[in-house]
Regions:
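A short beta-strand element within beta-rich, extracytoplasmic domains
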Residues: 53-61, 145-147
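Extracellular beta-rich ligand/substrate-recognition surface
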Residues: 28-40, 61-63, 117-127
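Short surface loop/edge beta-strand patches of beta-sandwich-type extracellular domains
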Residues: 42-45
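Short loop/turn segments at connectors of secondary-structure elements within structured domains
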Residues: 5, 66-68, 139
Length: 171
């Protein structure tokens, strides 16, 4: 949805910049071991002012035969809700062993409901997942992407530096 403009409205540089997408890129490969409890990613988070936003995540990840991939969810501050209460996820399914697997996920989940992406071929091969949702922000607050291993194991699961968050204000 385009940012709302009204006939005769004065358009300023500040007003134009309000609707420009903001990109937040993961800064380095990050590994987590021996955990299935999603915790906030140190990079993939942003503080939002009141308004309506499209939130898009592109996730590069990997796992091993032991760790199996990643599980994801979101945490948000009070005053932030998902419009329609769900996020849409797509990528390799939790039973996938390679990124070329026919096992895929295309689902709607609540923000705190874990989505599981499988991949067991190690860090040399990365899987790709996408998540999208629309946020209604009534009070300033932060949204945080969270992740952990699919299966707790000493072998790590990774989120890659090509992962990014795109946030676009739509209202």
């Amino acid at each position: 949805m385009p940012f709302p403009w009204l006939a005769g409205q004065r358009i300023t540089a500040e007003r134009l910049m309000e609707s420009a997408p903001v990109y937040i890129q993961k800064t380095a490969l990050q590994s987590r071991t021996s955990t299935v409890t999603p915790t906030a990613d140190p990079d993939l988070r942003i503080t939002l002012d009141p308004g309506t936003y499209d939130i898009e995540l592109e996730l590069g990840y990997s796992g091993t035969a032991g760790s199996g991939g990643v599980r994801t969810s979101w945490s948000v501050d009070a005053g932030i809700t998902a419009i329609s209460g769900i996020r849409f996820t797509r990528g390799t399914g939790q039973d996938a062993t390679t990124r070329n697997s026919d096992a895929s996920r295309h689902t709607g989940n609540g923000l705190s409901t874990e989505a599981i992406y499988g991949l067991t071929t190690g860090s040399g091969q990365r899987g790709w997942g996408s998540e999208r949702w629309r946020a209604l922000v009534t009070a300033p607050g932060e949204i945080r992407f969270q992740w952990a291993q699919k299966t707790s194991h000493a072998d790590g699961s990774w989120v890659a530096p090509e992962s990014f968050l795109k946030v676009t204000r739509t209202g």
